[in-house]
Amino acid sequence: MNILSCSTNILNGFYDISGVEVGQHFYWKIGGFQVHGQVLITSWVVIAILLGSAALAVRKPQTIPTGIQNFFEYVLEFIRDVSKTQIGEEYGPWVPFIGTIFLFIFVSNWSGALLPWKIIQLPHGELAAPTNDINTTVALALLTSVAYFYAGLAKKGLGYFGKYIQPTPILLPINILEDFTKPLSLSFRLFGNILADELVVVVLVSLVPSVVPIPVMFLGLFTSGIQALIFATLAAAYIGESMEGHH
C-alpha cells in the first residue's frame, strides 16, 4: 500500500513538474487543456528542419554519397554504433527511435543559439529552444520510459517484472522507485543545462559588448551536442538494461 501511495505521489509530482514556468508563456486552448503555444511552434520548426533535411538527403541518392547525404550517413553510422554498444546485438529495431531522440534534441538545442527566435513577437512570452521548456524534456523522458518498458515486456513477457525482486525481494521498493527516478533525471538534466546556457548568454549580452559572449555561445553549442548524446546514450542503455535484466 505504501508503494502504491509513493508511486501515486511521484506521478502527481510529474504533473506538477509539467506546470513549472520560467518567465512568461503564450498559451493555447485545445479542448479543455491549456498548452504552451510557443513550445509547439518551435517544436514544429525543428521537426520541419529535420524532415526537410532528410528529404534533401534522399532526393537523389548516390552510390558514393556527397554533401548532405554523406552527412546523414555519417550520423546514421554514429547512432548505430551508440545503439549497438548500449543495447547489444538486438539493437537494429531501436536505431530509428534512438536516432529520432538524438536528432530532435540536438537540433532543438542548437536552434536556441542559432535561430533568431527573439525577432518573432508573441502576445505573451517569447520563443526559445523546445528543450528550454520542462514540458518537452519530461515528454521525451516519459517516451523513453515507455520504450524501455515495451522493450522488456516484448523480450521477456510478464517475466520482465521479476527484475523488481532481484537480487533480493527486499529491494522491491528501490527497484520500483528507480523506474520513476530515471525519467526525472533525464528530464531535469536536459532542461537545466539548456535553460542555464540560454540564461548565461542573455545575461552576458545585456552586460557586455556583443562580441564577448561569442566564446560562451560556442561552448553552449558544444554542451548542447553533448547533452543530446548523453540523453540518447542513456535511453539506449535503459532499453538494453530492460532487455537483458542487468542493473
From Swiss-Prot:
Subcellular location: Plastid, Chloroplast thylakoid membrane
Family matches, as InterPro entries: ATP_syn_F0_a_bact/chloroplast (IPR045082), ATP_synth_F0_asu (IPR000568), ATP_synth_F0_asu_AS (IPR023011), F0_ATP_A_sf (IPR035908)
GO cellular component: chloroplast thylakoid membrane; plasma membrane; proton-transporting ATP synthase complex
Main location (coarse class): plastid
PROSITE patterns: ATPASE_A
Swiss-Prot/TrEMBL keywords: ATP synthesis, CF(0), Chloroplast, Hydrogen ion transport, Ion transport, Membrane, Plastid, Thylakoid, Transmembrane, Transmembrane helix, Transport
A GO molecular-function descriptor: proton-transporting ATP synthase activity, rotational mechanism
Spans traversing the lipid bilayer: 38-58, 95-115, 134-154, 199-219, 220-240
Domain of life the protein comes from: Eukaryota
Pfam family, one: ATP-synt_A
Mode of membrane association: Multi-pass membrane protein
Keyword field contains Transport: yes
Quaternary structure annotation from Swiss-Prot or TrEMBL: F-type ATPases have 2 components, CF(1) - the catalytic core - and CF(0) - the membrane proton channel. CF(1) has five subunits: alpha(3), beta(3), gamma(1), delta(1), epsilon(1). CF(0) has four main subunits: a, b, b' and c.
Protein family according to the UniProt entry: Belongs to the ATPase A chain family.
Protein's name in the database: ATP synthase subunit a, chloroplastic
Annotated organism of origin: Trachelium caeruleum (Blue throatwort)
